[in-house]
Every structure is written in structure tokens, then in C-alpha cells.
Amino acid sequence: MVVEIKGITEPAQFAKLPDALSALLASLRALPLGIEQLEYFDELFDPGSVQRIGHRIVAYGEVRALAFLGLTPHVVKVYTAGHEAPR
């Protein structure tokens, strides 16, 4: 599994989806995001979301969300290794 926050982090590869989501959530929590965004990402990528996220990756090839730092959006992506995420 690969996770990245475009413009902030390089793609990081993990053997297991739970590890990837945990690392992504830690990276998001380190950013100066508003409380609403942090709560959204906590819910979206929490440990209980592994099955749901995995299903979406199988169905759609990736999962995307947006993180806003000020007025600047950054795409947050989770996708399978070997699958180049669409830009």
C-alpha cells in the first residue's frame, strides 16, 4: 500500500493497509489542520476503517481526500503499490 499527501510528503510504501493508514493519520495529525479536518481524517482513516478503505481501493483503485493548509488544497491518497495513482 502507498500513502501520500501531495506537495507535503513523498509516497510511502507499506506491506499492510493498517500500517499505511496509521502512518498517514500520524502525518496528517502533525500538520496545522483545523479541528474539523483532524476529526474528519481521524474518522476516515481510523483503525476501524481498514475494511471500508480496502473495499474502495479494490473497487476504485485508490482513496482520495483533500487536506487544506490555509487555502491550499493537498490531495491525500491511498493506493496499491505498483498502481500509479491518477494525477
Range-by-range predicted roles:
Residues 1-9:
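Short aromatic-glycine-(Arg/Gly/Cys) micro-motifs in beta-strand/loop hairpins
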Residues 11-13:
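Well-ordered beta-strand positions in beta-sheet-rich domains
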Residues 15-37:
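A short, charged, amphipathic alpha-helix used as a generic interaction element across diverse proteins
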